[in-house]
């Protein structure tokens, strides 16, 4: 199936487990996390933007389009996803969280293959042990259903995905590539590593 695809880096959360710090702007080897994400995405998709509800001018200074959630307050990643779908010109949007800088170069390829093969509107990552719904490829056509879902008070990503026929895609061969930097302790640990060869997918 021929489809147009854009990508969005999800950086709109409150980062409670990081003491409220803006995750995407935390430095890893001297570079903001979101720039690691952007670099890995750029080899897979041409049109990339960032969903951020804070520090938008800082993100925008990197030359990447930035947008906040249309819904007021912090409603979780689905709120940013809804706004992304509402503003998208592409048929599908690839979503990636801002705290996972090691994801594989074949992320889009495998998710798109699953969407094509199964004829579904959503495909997301499973690393063999855990589901990673914020790594997903989602059809713009779901924006109406997602708006209704959020208006009902629901916030659970996997529930929405399952209700809409999502398929999980096996990335167990690259499980370590979905390691996320969730806390300040995680950030300290990774900043102490000389390189990330043990995490970045081959």
Task: Explain the meaning of each model-derived region.
Residues 202:
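Cytosolic-facing loops and C-terminal tails of multi-pass membrane proteins
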Residues 2-134, 140-154, 159-178, 184-198:
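Nucleotide and nucleotide-moiety/phosphate-recognizing core
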């Amino acid at each position: 199936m021929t489809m147009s695809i854009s990508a969005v880096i999800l950086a709109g959360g409150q980062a409670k487990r990081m003491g409220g710090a803006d995750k995407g702007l935390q430095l890893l080897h001297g570079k903001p996390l979101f720039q690691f994400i952007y670099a890995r995405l750029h080899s897979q998709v041409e049109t990339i933007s960032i969903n951020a509800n804070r520090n938008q001018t800082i993100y925008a200074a990197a030359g990447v389009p930035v947008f906040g959630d249309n819904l007021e307050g912090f409603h979780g990643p689905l709120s940013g996803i809804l706004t992304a779908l509402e503003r998208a010109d592409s048929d599908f949007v690839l979503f990636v969280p801002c705290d996972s800088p090691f994801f594989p170069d074949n992320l889009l390829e495998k998710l798109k293959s699953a969407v094509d093969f199964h004829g579904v509107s959503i495909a997301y990552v499973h690393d063999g042990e855990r589901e990673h719904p914020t790594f997903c490829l989602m059809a713009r056509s779901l924006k109406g259903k997602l708006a209704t879902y959020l208006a009902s008070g629901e916030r659970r990503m996997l529930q929405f995905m399952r209700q809409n026929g999502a398929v999980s895609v096996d990335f167990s061969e690259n499980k370590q590539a979905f390691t996320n930097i969730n806390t300040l302790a995680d950030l300290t640990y990774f900043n102490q590593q000389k390189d990330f060869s043990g995490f970045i997918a081959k």
